[in-house]
Amino acid sequence: MDNDKIDQHSDEIEVESEEKERGKKIEIDEDRLPSRAMAIHEHIRQDGEKELERDAMALLWSAIAAGLSMGASLLAKGIFQVELEGVPGSFLLENLGYTFGFIIVIMARQQLFTENTVTAVLPVMQKPTMSNVGLLIRLWGVVLLGNILGTGIAAWAFEYMPIFNEETRDAFVKIGMDVMKNTPSEMFANAIISGWLIATMVWMFPAAGAAKIVVIILMTWLIALGDTTHIVVGSVEILYLVFNGTLHWSDFIWPFALPTLAGNICGGTFIFALMSHAQIRNDMSNKRKAEARQKAERAENIKKNYKNPA
């Protein structure tokens, strides 16, 4: 009886795909696929299916942990800003601190919303059914909620726990206020760039191997150097201003959160994921044609062997 319940629950959160309909796994072996790009696409799509099928509470706790971890970006950048004041090239080194949170989150396999703007989207693009779209909305909603909760806890701790000196706290305020200098349209435009760069980073992971951490550092450092906006890192920075009384709660929602969230989704999903999926559509068509041809040839061989037994 219990096993039946478990099976029913698993069926409810199963991604619909052509492979599952045929009882097969996603092919990720480059030698068996038409192109290297398709091998990367299929590898990421496989990861996306796993994320879409995860239990909601597991996703939530992982997302909260990711939000807390992203506090390391504000922490490192603030400390670097104070300690490196007056040092030549300090701007480059300060922004290197921005990468710390991403390194922790990605290497620890925690749930980051902007990663899922490409990873979890590919299975839906492959088979855009209402069930798959529902799973994507569920994943995005749970992970975004968890990330915001985690960043809120981190920001609260930075403000109210006796951890940092006044110089570091002032640096946190300056970092947050630099973000708030952007207009809503600038928030949106900058977020498109950061969403696109995060999606590019995710696309590079399958080929990165042991150099994955280098890819994380380079891509997220570039996000920081470009003063782009990111919904999760920015939430730590802006919520810190809310908790110390510099900003009202409404300022977090607008002009920051809504334009930034829309920009990240646009950059990661509507630009990068669509383009990446489009480039391998013909490869997928050719793969299906090759499979159909092989199936027909096998059937023909079986028929010949049946007519002409040895």
From Swiss-Prot:
It is a multi-pass membrane protein. Gene3D superfamilies: Glycerol uptake facilitator protein. It comes from the Bacteria. Coiled coil: none annotated. Residues 1-27, 291-310 are annotated as: Disordered. InterPro entries: Aquaporin-like, For/NO2_transpt. Residues 1-12, 291-303 have a biased composition (Basic and acidic residues). One of its GO terms (cellular component) is plasma membrane. GO terms for biological process: formate transport. GO terms for molecular function: formate transmembrane transporter activity. Keywords: Cell inner membrane, Cell membrane, Membrane, Transmembrane, Transmembrane helix. The chain crosses the membrane at residues 59-81, 91-113, 134-156, 187-206, 213-232, 252-274. It is found in: Cell inner membrane. Residues 1-58, 114-133, 207-212, 275-310 are cytoplasmic. Residues 82-90, 157-186, 233-251 are periplasmic. The keyword Transmembrane applies. This is Inner membrane protein YfdC.
